[in-house]
Design a protein with these regions (language model features):
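Hydrophobic alpha-helical transmembrane segments
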Residues: 1-71, 99, 111, 127-132, 159-160, 200-215, 222-236, ...
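Helix-capping/transition residues at the boundaries of transmembrane alpha-helices
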Residues: 11, 69, 80-82, 141, ...
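Secretory targeting signals
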Residues: 29-36, 40-55, 97-164, 170-181
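Transmembrane helix segments
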Residues: 32-35, 155-252
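Alpha-helical transmembrane segments of polytopic membrane proteins
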Residues: 50-53, 130-137, 183-194, 213, ...
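Helix-loop-helix units of permease transmembrane domains in multi-pass membrane transporters
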Residues: 67-97
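Alpha-helix N-cap/helix-start motif at helix boundaries, enriched for small hydrophobics
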Residues: 88-92, 148, 281
Length: 287
C-alpha cells in the first residue's frame, strides 16, 4: 500500500491537477473568508467554510476522475490486478494519496482562526470544529469519487457522474420536497429502488435465480407492509433521502458541536464507498 500511495501522490504533485485543486479550494474559501470574516467582522470561520464547500462538488470529481479510470484506459490496471498486492491496498493507497492532497489546503485553513485572533476574540473551539466537519465532508466526497472512477475507464464520465451524484446529495432537501409524505409515494419510490438494487446485484453475481428470489422477497415484503400497515411507510422516502444529505451533517460542526453521529456518518460513507470500489476492482480481477 505504501508504494501505491507514494506513486499516486507523486503523480498528483508532479502534474497540475493537484495544485489546481488546492488553488481553487483556497481561492474560493478566501473569498468567503474576506466577505464574512474580514468585512463583516464575524469571529468564526464556519460559515465561510460552509459557503465555500460547494466548490468541492466540482473540484473533487475533477481530482478523482483519473485515479482508477486512467489505469483502466491505459490497461495498466492489469499490472495492478496481477501483482501480489491486495485489492484493499490498491484502493486505500490511492484514496489516502487523494486525501493527502485535500489535507494540504485544509491545514492552511487552520491558520485563518489564528489570523482572526490577532484582530479580536475568536472561539478557536468553534472554528476548528468547523474545519473538522469540512475535512470529513471532503473526505466523504473523495471516497464517492474513487468509487465512481472504479466503474468506468473514461475520465470525463467519471467526473460528470461524480459531480451529478454529489450535486444530487447537495440538493437532497429540495428533492425530498417533491415527494408527498403519504404512504403511496413511499411505496412507489421504494418499489423502484428495490428493482434497481436487484438489477445491480444481478449484474454483480450473474445469477438470475438468486437475483429473482431477492427481488420477490424484497418487493413482496414491501407490498405486504403497504397493504397491512401503510402508516409505516409515511414520510419514509424523505427519511431515506435524508441519509444522502452529506452537506447537512456539517451544520452541527459549523455551530461548534462535535457531532459524534456526524463523524460516524462520514466514516460510514467512506467505508461503504471504498468497499464498493474494492468490489468493483475485485470483479475486474476475476474477469
Amino acid at each position: 500500500m505504501t508504494a501505491i500511495y507514494k506513486k499516486e501522490l507523486k503523480s498528483y504533485l508532479t502534474s497540475m491537477i493537484g495544485y489546481l485543486f488546492m488553488a481553487f479550494t483556497l481561492a474560493l474559501f478566501g473569498r468567503y473568508f474576506t466577505a464574512i470574516n474580514l468585512q463583516q467582522g464575524y469571529p468564526e470561520i464556519g460559515y465561510a467554510l460552509q459557503n465555500s464547500a460547494f466548490i468541492l462538488l466540482i473540484a473533487v470529481p475533477v481530482l478523482t476522475m483519473r485515479v482508477l479510470s486512467e489505469e483502466q484506459k491505459n490497461k495498466t490496471d492489469q499490472l495492478l490486478l496481477t501483482a501480489p498486492v491486495k485489492i484493499s491496498d490498491i484502493i486505500l493507497g490511492k484514496y489516502l494519496a487523494l486525501l493527502t492532497i485535500y489535507v494540504i489546503p485544509v491545514l492552511i485553513m487552520c491558520l485563518y482562526p489564528l489570523l482572526l485572533g490577532t484582530h479580536g476574540t475568536v472561539s478557536y473551539a468553534v472554528s476548528y470544529t468547523s474545519i473538522l466537519g469540512y475535512f470529513l465532508l471532503g473526505a466523504a466526497y473523495i471516497s464517492v469519487g474513487v468509487f465512481v472512477s472504479s466503474i468506468t475507464e473514461s475520465q470525463v464520465i467519471a467526473a460528470v457522474v461524480g459531480f451529478v451524484i454529489l450535486f444530487l446529495c447537495y440538493v437532497e432537501s429540495g428533492i425530498a420536497n417533491f415527494f408527498p409524505e403519504g404512504a403511496g409515494s413511499s411505496f412507489f419510490a421504494f418499489f423502484i429502488i428495490i428493482a434497481l438494487v436487484c438489477l445491480w446485484i444481478g449484474s454483480m453475481i450473474k445469477n438470475p435465480i438468486i437475483t429473482g428470489v431477492i427481488a420477490v422477497i424484497g418487493e413482496g415484503a414491501l407490498t405486504t407492509v403497504y397493504f397491512t400497515k401503510s402508516t409505516l411507510l409515511e414520510g419514509k422516502i424523505q427519511d431515506l433521502l435524508g441519509v444522502f444529505n452529506m452537506a447537512g451533517h456539517m451544520d452541527n460542526f459549523v455551530n461548534g458541536i462535535l457531532d459524534i453521529g456526524g463523524v460516524v456518518y462520514y466514516l460510514s460513507v467512506i467505508a461503504i464507498c471504498t468497499f464498493l470500489a474494492m468490489q468493483s476492482l475485485q470483479k475486474k480481477r476475476w474477469n
